[in-house]
Structure formats: C-alpha cells, structure tokens
Amino acid sequence: MFYLLGLRLLKYITFRMAYATIFAFLLSLIIGPHIILRLKKLRVDQVLREDGPKRHLSEKAGIPTMGGILIFFCVFISLVFWSNILNVYFLIMLFVMLGFAFLGFIDDFLKIKKKTSDGLKARFKIYGQIIFSFISVGTLYYFGSEHVSMIYFPFIKSFRIDLGLFYIPFGMFILISASNSFNLTDGLDGLAIGLSIVITGALIIIAYLTSRADFAAYLHIPNIKGSEELVIFLGALLGGSFGFLWFNAYPAKIMMGDTGSLALGAILGMAALIVKSEILFSILAGVFIIETMSVIIQVMVYKKTKKRVFKMAPLHHHFEELGWSEMQVVIRFWIIGLIFAIIALSTIKIR
C-alpha cells in the first residue's frame, strides 16, 4: 500500500525490507498473547503422538496449536503495507503461503476434532500439495524470468542445465519435499522456526543479490528482474518468524502446527526456485534433510530387520533419548543450521 504511493524512499529495497520485518515482528508481539488466549479458550490444543518421547505427554499437554495463523497473519498485514502487491513473484509467494497454510489448517482441525495425531489422510494431503505446487510452479514457469528453467550449480561458474518443461515437476518435488521435511522437524520448542529464520535470512541475501544487476554480474549469478519484492516478502516472513519464536521458545506458549510447518517449508522452497538456488537450497535446508533421512532410514531398516538404527526418529528425538535436554537439542541444531547457511552463502563467491 505504501509502495503504491510512489514515495522515493519506498523505492529502496533495504528500507522496505527492514520495515516489513520490524512491522511483522511488532505486530506479532502485540496480537500474539490475544491469539494464544483465544486458541486456549477454543481448546485448540496440540495433539501429542503416543509413540513420541514420554515426557512430552506431560510437558506439552494443553499447549495451543495452529500458531501458523499468527505467523502468516502478521506477514500478510506487513506485506499489504510494504510490498508491491502487483508483482508476479509476490503473488506466487502469497498463493503458496495461503494454499499450504490452508492445507495445514485442515490437518490441524481434523486432529483436534478427532483428538488423535492422525489428521488429514496422507493421500489427501499429498494431493493437495501436488495441486498447490503445480499451480505455483507452473505460474512461475510461464511468468518468471528467462532463467526460470535453468539449474545452476555451486562452485561452477558457467555450467547450467536447462530442464525446459521438466522444470515444473522438478520444482514441485522441491516444494513438496520442503513442506514435508519442515513438518517432520517441527517437534521441539523453537526448533523448526529457529532453523527457518536462518534459512530465511540467507535467502534474503541471495534474493537481494539476484535483484541487483551489478552484484549478479560480479558474482556470476542470474539477475532476476522483479525479485526485489521477494526480499520484502522474506523480510516480513523473518519478522513474523521472530515474533512467533518469542512465544514458541522453550517453554512454548504456542505451537505452529501443520498450519505453520507445511507452509513454511513450501514458502522457502518457492523462494529458492525464484532466485535459482535450487541446489543451494539443499545445503541451506541440510538439517531438515538429515531429519527426513533419519525417518526414512529408520522405517526401511525396521521393515527389513525389525531393528532400529535410532532410538527414535526424527533425529531430534534420538538425541532426547540419549539424554540431551530439549534446549540442548534445539540450540545445537540451530548452530548446525547456521553452519550450513554459511557454507551455502560462501559458494556464491567460490565459482
């Protein structure tokens, strides 16, 4: 809204990004307690898995879920004020946010209604993810930059692969994988949102560099015209995420639920597609990939041998079972996530 006023100051990406971040963060702090209280009154409590860590059954009982509502409401309001709402990348990101959040909301709602940890059936969830990812990636393919179907590789300056139409299923795979990986990792207070903040910060830097022709030419990365609005979008997401972490830090007052985790993964996955950092995203999301692989390995090995590789999966529960405190697991995983982000960002220059 402010952008459309045409004020000169609002043409500066860094200014709008900074205030989109601050606006979303402060709004979260203001309305967060009211949303938490409202969810408690509605008895929208986190439904805990019986096969999870036993101490969670007592420690996390009664904590309201659907906290993704808080994140994305604050992000949306901030974007209305600070973003160019006519930008194609803004519209794609908004669609991904609302679509996957809606899917997660249905999942959370069914869990609460049935009072079990089984919400939306897996096949219906994946159908929804396929539909939303196909629409969003397809739109990106037809309205994106001239680089849209190109895959760029870290450490290699000039080598790239043009996937053509096959970029659509490739992009869909990234969105769906990211969405589900973030969902699996959301099991401890502050874990998933803290890692998301690290990735969001890294993608803001990448999006800013790709939006500037001078930086893009110097670093030998594609110049994505219009991607400056992605910087604003991610800035608002960063602020909303920090605001949510304020209440989600141990001991959590609210959980993001599938409403938050399914959408967060998809949003960051789409951001990586827009700025042509698909391969780089696999480094940025290293902790999420490791968490997902721990579940896959656990299931596959147990089916064949009836033995478990880990004491419990995903991996963060394994370390809890080894005696690590919840905060130790969370902070150490944050540190590892930050290291992955530093490695990913360093590859931009090392070409």
From Swiss-Prot:
PROSITE patterns: MRAY_1, MRAY_2. Pathway: Cell wall biogenesis; peptidoglycan biosynthesis. It holds the Pfam family MraY_sig1. Disulfide bonds: none annotated. CDD domains: GT_MraY. Its EC number is 2.7.8.13. It comes from the Bacteria. GO terms for biological process: cell division; cell wall organization; peptidoglycan biosynthetic process; regulation of cell shape. The keyword Ion transport does not apply. Its cofactor is Mg(2+). GO terms for cellular component: plasma membrane. GO terms for molecular function: metal ion binding; phospho-N-acetylmuramoyl-pentapeptide-transferase activity; UDP-N-acetylmuramoyl-L-alanyl-D-glutamyl-meso-2,6-diaminopimelyl-D-alanyl-D-alanine:undecaprenyl-phosphate transferase activity. It is an enzyme of class 2 (transferase). Its main location: membrane. It is found in: Cell inner membrane. Keywords: Cell cycle, Cell division, Cell inner membrane, Cell membrane, Cell shape, Cell wall biogenesis/degradation, Magnesium, Membrane, Metal-binding, Peptidoglycan synthesis, Transferase, Transmembrane, Transmembrane helix. The chain crosses the membrane at residues 17-37, 62-82, 85-105, 124-144, 161-181, 190-210, 230-250, 254-274, 279-299, 328-348. PANTHER family: PHOSPHO-N-ACETYLMURAMOYL-PENTAPEPTIDE-TRANSFERASE, PHOSPHO-N-ACETYLMURAMOYL-PENTAPEPTIDE-TRANSFERASE HOMOLOG. Belongs to the glycosyltransferase 4 family. MraY subfamily. Catalyzes the initial step of the lipid cycle reactions in the biosynthesis of the cell wall peptidoglycan: transfers peptidoglycan precursor phospho-MurNAc-pentapeptide from UDP-MurNAc-pentapeptide onto the lipid carrier undecaprenyl phosphate, yielding undecaprenyl-pyrophosphoryl-MurNAc-pentapeptide, known as lipid I. This is Phospho-N-acetylmuramoyl-pentapeptide-transferase. It comes from Borrelia garinii subsp. bavariensis (strain ATCC BAA-2496 / DSM 23469 / PBi) (Borreliella bavariensis).
